[in-house]
């Protein structure tokens, strides 16, 4: 029989939230506003990237649809369906092609293919037949080569890593290995620092590179931040001040770090305390502005809110990466 006179824990304050914020509760915080609804269904949206004309491309992982959004009209069109299973990211090449990372069977059949904006002229860049990668994301450097993340493993089996592919797409060089589900990746404006999120161990990696872009500088691989809560850090992007924006999957928010890896702000999805719109996956800036777009979905809330793009203004304008240079 319960003793009503004993001190009793109660759900008040932070403990009332489905996803309480504890260690970052004093950060500058803003709540995002709805921008575009992609679907009434709960789709695993990912891969936000703009082309040179300012059109936004994104995808849904599990059904493989590639979407285009016109920011001026907010019109959403489905352009094509991925020829590979579980696409996870889109990056636009300077020549206009879409480079699409895919996870395959989530074990050994991931890769990257390039295609036109209509899904034509497919070219294998990293083949799922000749490798064992499970590729989640990539980022181009100014030479036209790129870094990619290998999404394999889990918390006690760190099979993933980060690799660099030369501009001719023929040579793959390991940068850092033994990572548990390497996920988001971003490159600093001077291309000297590589940021990587490690999802299932809740870690942020900051990797200082030497001039060749593949050698880690002495004492250059550090972990400046450990995240808390379920599930963990996902895709990320930088602004022109080298601040890093990291989507927190399963938490309905984006954390912002300065160039040294210190947290300086956060962006919340509406309804997150009630368990809504928690699957925040990817932030990306509208070119030439400080307006940040964030994709998320409501799958964990029985897809009640569908799949959405939200928006806020960031600390600075977005950095215009390879496709704009």
Swiss-Prot record:
Binding site for Ca(2+) 2: 108, 110, 128, 131, 133
Entry annotated with the keyword Cytoplasm: yes
GO cellular component terms listed in the entry, alphabetical order: cytoplasm
Key words, A-Z: Calcium, Cytoplasm, Hydrolase, Metal-binding
Top-rank taxon, per record: Bacteria
Ligand binding (Ca(2+) 1): 46, 136, 183, 234-235
Location in or out of the cell: Cytoplasm
Active site: 234 (proton donor)
Protein EC: 3.1.1.-
InterPro entries: 6-blade_b-propeller_TolB-like, SGL, SMP-30/CGR1_Lactonase
UniProt signal peptide: none
Cofactor-binding details, from the entry: Binds 2 Ca(2+) ions per subunit.
One Pfam family per UniProt: SGL
Cofactor: Ca(2+)
Entry's Gene Ontology molecular function annotations: hydrolase activity; metal ion binding
PANTHER family assigned: LACTONASE DRP35, LIPOPROTEIN-RELATED
Function statement: Exhibits lactonase activity. Acts in cells with perturbed membrane integrity and is possibly related to the membrane homeostasis.
UniProt record similarity statement: Belongs to the SMP-30/CGR1 family.
Record's protein name: Lactonase drp35
Organism: Staphylococcus epidermidis (strain ATCC 35984 / DSM 28319 / BCRC 17069 / CCUG 31568 / BM 3577 / RP62A)
Gene: drp35
């Amino acid at each position: 029989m319960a003793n009503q006179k004993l001190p009793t824990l109660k759900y008040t304050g932070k403990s009332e939230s489905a996803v309480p914020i504890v260690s970052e509760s004093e950060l500058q915080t803003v709540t995002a506003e709805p921008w575009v609804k992609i679907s009434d269904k709960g789709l695993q949206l990912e891969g936000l990237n703009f082309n040179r004309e300012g059109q936004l491309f994104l995808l849904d992982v599990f059904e493989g649809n590639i979407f285009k959004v016109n920011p001026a009209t907010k019109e959403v069109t489905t352009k094509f369906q991925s020829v590979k299973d579980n696409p996870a990211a889109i990056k636009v090449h300077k020549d206009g092609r879409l480079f699409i990372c895919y996870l395959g069977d989530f074990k050994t059949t991931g890769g990257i293919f390039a295609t036109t904006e209509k899904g034509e002229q497919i070219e294998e860049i990293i083949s799922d037949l000749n490798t064992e990668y499970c590729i989640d994301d990539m980022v181009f450097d100014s030479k036209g080569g790129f870094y990619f993340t290998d999404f394999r493993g889990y918390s006690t089996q760190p099979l993933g890593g980060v690799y660099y592919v030369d501009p001719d797409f023929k040579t793959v060089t390991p940068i850092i290995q033994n990572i548990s589900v390497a996920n988001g990746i971003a490159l600093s404006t001077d291309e000297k620092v590589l940021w990587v999120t490690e999802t299932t161990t809740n870690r942020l990696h900051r990797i200082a590179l030497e001039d060749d872009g593949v050698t880690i500088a002495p004492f250059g691989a550090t972990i400046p931040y450990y995240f808390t809560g379920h599930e963990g850090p996902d895709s990320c992007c930088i602004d022109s001040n080298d601040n890093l924006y990291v989507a927190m999957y399963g938490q309905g928010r984006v954390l912002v770090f300065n160039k040294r890896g210190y947290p300086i702000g956060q962006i919340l999805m509406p309804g997150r305390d009630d368990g809504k719109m928690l699957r925040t996956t990817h932030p990306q800036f509208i070119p030439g502005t400080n307006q940040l777009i964030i994709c998320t979905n409501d799958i964990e809330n029985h897809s009640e809110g569908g799949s959405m793009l939200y928006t806020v203004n960031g600390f600075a304008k977005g950095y215009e990466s390879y496709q704009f240079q």
